[in-house]
Amino acid sequence: MNMVVIGVTGMPGAGKGVVSRIAESMGFRVIRMGDVIRDEARKRGEDPGVTAVRLREEYGKYVVAEKCVERIQESESEMFLIEGIRSPHEVEIFRKRFPGFRVISVFSTRKTRFRRLRKRQREDDSQRYAEFVERDERELGFGIGDVIATSDYMIVNEGPIWKIKKQAKQILRKLAEKGEESSRGGQEDG
């Protein structure tokens, strides 16, 4: 089997984590770009949003993607899902390093995402709407809108959770099968 590397993108609270959990259940190794940021933020004693900006200022726009590439290359797995792609530069790195790299975007309205984040209560989740909007603006500043707009697959996540799970399984299964076909010399259909 050829290595299968898939990226998932979406604004905070859109449902990337649901797609990642489905991927894990299917045997994918999930690499979370946000974990790279959160780990570094803890070391620095900073807010993860501040760290995300500073890392890119200090080490360049490819820094988080390069750290993910290292994790992939160190692993023995053959199927990977990279959660949390934020910029076209990151997509560029993954496409250069991994032929056949595809991006799945998950979309939810701002209202839906804010409601989910308030329930989730992760350390970097905003409980105030103004902070939530500020985080959205920061994400958009990284170029996430362009990544979403140019993704290979899109899942609209406004309904019950079973719908996103079903769509994610279908897309991931299709991409995993293409990886198997590539290793056997099969043709890709798109």
From Swiss-Prot:
Keywords: ATP-binding, Nucleotide-binding. It comes from the Archaea. GO terms for molecular function: ATP binding. Pfam families: AAA_17 (PF13207). Gene3D superfamilies: P-loop containing nucleotide triphosphate hydrolases. ATP binds at residues 10-17. InterPro entries: NTP_hydrolase-rel, P-loop_NTPase. SUPFAM superfamilies: P-loop containing nucleoside triphosphate hydrolases. Belongs to the UPF0200 family. This is UPF0200 protein MTH_434.
